Each structure stands twice: as C-alpha cells, then as structure tokens.
Regions:
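SIR2/sirtuin-family catalytic core signature
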Residues: 1-28, 255-371
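Intrinsically disordered, low-complexity regions enriched in small/polar residues
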Residues: 17, 27-30, 62, 71-72, ...
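Glycine-rich loops and low-complexity Gly/Arg-rich segments
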Residues: 33-36, 219-222, 238-243, 291-294, ...
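Extended, H/D-rich, highly charged conserved domains that either
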Residues: 39-254, 259-262
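Short catalytic helix/loop segments, enriched in acidic residues and glycine
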Residues: 25-47
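Conserved beta-strand -> loop -> alpha-helix junction used to position metal-binding or nucleic-acid-contacting
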Residues: 11, 27-30, 215, 219-220
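Active-site catalytic pocket residues across diverse enzymes, especially alpha/beta-hydrolases
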Residues: 32, 207-210, 288-291
Length: 371
C-alpha cells in the first residue's frame, strides 16, 4: 500500500476569476464600496492610476503602487497634501461659519477645486449649497488621512467581497474541477493543505471540502481582517510604515515554508508568484533548483495564457537566482494554461486522472472545458 502523499495547494486571484467571481481590482474600484472620494493624497494618487486599463490591473499592481506613492513623496516624514494652503484656509472658514449667506461666492474656484478633490460635495443645486457635508478629516494631516485611507480600502474591499459571496454552482471551469479532484484525492487518503492568498472562502455548491484545511495567508473577509500592503523588506520612514504588510496588527500569516519543504506535490492556481510574496516561495524554488542535493517534487501551475506563463517563468527565474533550467531538469514542472486548454488538454487530462478522476469522466470534463 502506498504511503499517503502530502499535497500543498496555493491559490491566487486567478482561481476566483476562473470561478467567475468578480474579484478584479477594477470590479472593486467601480463599486460603491471603494473609498475613491475620500480626501487623502493616497486615494488621489490611486485614482490617477490606470485610467484606461483598470481591467488589466492585478492586485499586486495595487500593492506596488503603494510603494510608488511612498517613493513619490518629497518628504515622507511630513507627507504631501493635495489641499493647498488657500484651500485649507477656506475649509477652516467652512468649519467656523458653515455655508450661510454664500460668503464664499468670491472663492468659487477654490470651492470647485475642493469638490473635484472629493473634499466638498454637492448637495443639489445651486453651487451655493456645497459645504453642508464638509469632511472634517480634510483638516487633519495628510499622513493621518493616508493611514485612514488604507483602512477604508481594506474595510471597503471586505464589504464588497461579502456582497458578492455565494456558493459556487457546478460550473465548467478548470478551478471547479480542480476542487473536485482535490476532494477525491483527499478521500483516497492523501493529505492536502490549501494556502489561499485570496480573501474569499474556498467553497462550492453541493460539494464540501471541510476535510481539507484552508489557510488564509492575508486574512479573509469573513473575519473582517485582511492585509493589504507592500512587501516588508523595504526601508520606510516610520510615519509611513503602515504601508508595509508586516506592520499590520492582523498580520499573522501561517507557516507555508515548512509545508512546502515537506510536500510531495505542489499545485499552484492563479498566483503570479510576484515580488510582494517572494519571501514565501523563494526558499522552496531555490531548494528545488539545487543540483547538489536534487529532490524531485511534482509541481503543477495553472495560469491563464501565454503572457501569464511567461510572467510565471520570469518570476521563477528570479527566485531560483537564474537556475530555471535546473528547476525544470530536476522537477519537470507542468504549466497548464486555462485559456489555452485546446493545446494543453492532454496535460489537464493527465492531471485529473492522476488525482483520482475517472478516465471517462476526465474526458467528459475536457470536452466541456473546450466548448
């Protein structure tokens, strides 16, 4: 009798997208849950990013943009405000006098500027009625507002994901049939652990995976505690180190390094293996590219298309310190492109059959996926 195998499954946002969940950054940005009108310099910066191609923005792009924003600050110890001194003086008068009598009519250019920046809001017409919803936060320091803005992004994203959360129905998707295959593999006696970098639940209608442990690397929206930030190997002024993932009070990621080391098989679905999560994967892939002490592991990576496949290989090249050939020679990793299954159908078939899927049913699955 064969010994049970240890299988580690790593999920990224591509997994949720393959299940047809609207979990792109663009989906969140276009929703009412995104705090894009909050008067913080950070929000103003993010609103200017990717105006023509938000549909292509990945979550790691957002995390990288947090770093770009920090690097754009002339003096991080003071921050950089979007509100000018004249606008601040006008806001202070609003605080003192309100909008009565339209005293600000000779400063409408400043009023319009503040409206455009999301600091003041219209409350109907005419323009003389602006100011009724003065945002008191606007008078606080830009650093204070940026820190609150990041918290609002997390809160808004949690609420957005809860609003779209529902059991996944039986579907024709590679992600769905991966879950079915994992369920059958666990029932056959192998040990499986799922490590997800998503904030969503791993569940699907009519099929329970309760016996498979699921570890959320960066929190989950059910608990209302999620981690968004840039990588923690950077030097930042203490005023802005709240942008680092590791500085979040909720940051207690489970150990993934040891399970990867002990695994017989590693399955990755929809994760870019990008720079911001490099610390989790680099030790594993560097070890698997060691010709002096070769230990083969089964590695299967599900990604979307040719472009994402190239990005994956570039990430692996970097994590193995240029030993991509050694990684391939020792382990023979398999990359399956979910949007190119016509070309990769044999790879998908072999994967399903190797994970306790009936051969006839595996053929049916491939047929449905190719429709």
């Amino acid at each position: 009798m064969e010994e049970p195998r240890k299988i580690i499954v790593i999920l990224g946002n591509g997994f949720d997208l393959d299940l047809n969940l609207k979990t792109r950054y663009q989906d969140f940005w276009e929703s009412d849950y995104c705090p894009k009108r909050y008067p913080a310099p950070l929000i103003h910066h993010l609103n200017q990013c990717w105006p023509d191609n938000r549909n292509a923005v990945k979550w790691y792009d957002l995390e990288n943009e947090l770093l770009n924003y920090y690097n754009s600050l002339p003096d991080p110890s003071k921050g950089h405000d979007i509100i000018t001194d004249d606008e601040r003086a006008l806001l202070e008068k609003f605080t003192a006098y309100g909008h009565a009598c339209g005293w600000y009519q000779d400063q409408l250019d400043l009023v319009v500027s503040l409206v455009n920046k999301g600091v003041l809001e219209y409350n109907g017409n005419p323009l003389g009625r602006v100011g009724e919803h003065l945002k008191e936060d606007a008078l606080k320091s830009p650093i204070w507002r940026d820190k609150k803005a990041l918290g609002l992004i997390k809160e808004g994203l949690c609420n957005y994901l809860k609003s779209i959360d529902k059991p996944i129905p039986d579907s024709v998707s590679s992600a769905f049939h991966l879950l079915l295959a994992l369920k059958k593999t666990a029932e056959a006696g192998d040990f499986i652990d799922i490590f997800t970098f998503n904030y969503t639940r791993v569940q699907f209608h009519g099929h329970t995976i309760d016996d498979i442990p699921v570890h959320h690397m960066h929190g989950n929206c059910e608990d209302g505690k999620i981690i968004i930030g840039t990588r923690d190997d950077l030097k930042m002024a203490k005023e802005y180190d709240f942008l680092l993932k590791a500085m979040d009070d909720s940051f207690t990621p489970p150990d993934i390094v040891t399970p990867l080391k002990e695994a017989d098989e590693v399955i990755i679905f929809g994760h870019s293996l990008g720079e911001n999560d490099r610390q989790y994967f680099a030790p594993f892939f560097l070890r698997q590219a060691d010709f002096d002490n070769p230990v083969r592991k089964d590695i299967t990576i599900f990604t979307r298309d040719d472009n994402s496949k190239v990005e994956i290989k570039r990430a692996l090249q970097k994590m193995t310190d240029g030993k991509l050939s050694a990684l391939w020679s020792i382990n023979q990793p398999v990359i399956i492109r979910t949007a190119n299954l016509k070309e990769d159908q044999q790879l998908m078939y072999d994967f399903l059959v190797a994970h306790h899927t009936d051969k006839h049913y595996a053929s049916e699955v491939i047929g449905k996926l190719l429709q």
